[in-house]
Amino acid sequence: MGEVLEFEEYVRTRQDALLRSARRLVPDPVDAQDLLQTALARTYGRWETIEDKRLADAYLRRVMINTRTEWWRARKLEEVPTEQLPESPMDDATEQHADRALLMDVLKVLAPKQRSVVVLRHWEQMSTEETAAALGMSAGTVKSTLHRALARLREELVARDLDARALEREERERCAA
C-alpha cells in the first residue's frame, strides 16, 4: 500500500514537468497526454523495482521515449509519403510562440533518437552524462548524435527560410504584374 501512495504522490508532484517533457517529444497535446499516461501506467507496474526514487524522472522519460518510438514505428508503416507536407497551424499571438511552433515542427525531420537527444540536452537541460544514462548510450554517442541533429536542424531552417523568401518574391512579382 505504501508503494501505491508513494507513486501517487510522485505523480501529483511531477505531473506538470512530465507533461512538458511529453510535449517536447510529441507535438500534439493530446498525443502528449496519451504518451504520459501510457508511460505512467508502464512505470506503475515496475515502481517497486526503481530502487533510487530520485532517478524516477529519468526512468519515466526513458519509458516515454521508448513508447514514442514504438508509436512512431507503428505509424511509419501507415504513413503515405506526400510531395509536400501540410503546414501546421500556428497561433501567432507572439513571435516567441511562433518560433517555438517552428522549432517543434522542424524537430519532426529528425529521427527519434536524434530528437530525444536534442530534447533532453536543450529543452530538459540535461548534461551529456545524464542524457547518455537516460537513453542508454555512451556520452560520445550523445555528442555525435547531437552534433548531427543540430546540423540537420540548421539545414532544415535554412531551407525553410529560402522557401519562404522565394514565395515572397513570387508574390511581389505577381502583384507587380
Swiss-Prot record:
Q: What induces it?
A: By CseB, in response to cell envelope stress.
Question: Subcellular localization, per the record?
Answer: Cytoplasm
**Which residue ranges hold the DNA-binding region?**
128-147
The record's section on SUPFAM superfamilies has: Sigma2 domain of RNA polymerase sigma factors (SSF88946), Sigma3 and sigma4 domains of RNA polymerase sigma factors (SSF88659)
Q: InterPro entries under this entry?
A: RNA_pol_sigma-70-like (IPR039425), RNA_pol_sigma-70_dom (IPR014284), RNA_pol_sigma-E_actinobac (IPR014325), RNA_pol_sigma70_ECF_CS (IPR000838), RNA_pol_sigma70_r2 (IPR007627), RNA_pol_sigma70_r4_t2 (IPR013249), RNA_pol_sigma_r2 (IPR013325), RNA_pol_sigma_r3/r4-like (IPR013324)
A molecular function GO annotation: DNA binding
Q: Which UniProt keywords apply?
A: Cytoplasm, DNA-binding, Sigma factor, Transcription, Transcription regulation
Query: Which superkingdom is the protein from?
Result: Bacteria
Q: Which Pfam families match?
A: Sigma70_r2 (PF04542), Sigma70_r4_2 (PF08281)
Q: What's an example GO cellular component term for this entry?
A: cytoplasm
Q: Which GO terms describe its biological process?
A: DNA-templated transcription initiation; regulation of DNA-templated transcription; response to stress
Q: At which positions is motif Polymerase core binding? A: 34-47
What the protein does comes down to: Sigma factors are initiation factors that promote the attachment of RNA polymerase to specific initiation sites and are then released. This sigma factor is required for normal cell wall integrity; it is recruited by RNA polymerase to transcribe genes with cell wall-related functions. It is also involved in the transcription of the dagA gene coding for an extracellular agar-degrading enzyme.
Family note = Belongs to the sigma-70 factor family. ECF subfamily.
* Protein's name according to its UniProt entry: RNA polymerase sigma-E factor
Q: Which organism is it from?
A: Streptomyces coelicolor (strain ATCC BAA-471 / A3(2) / M145)
Q: What's the name of its gene?
A: sigE
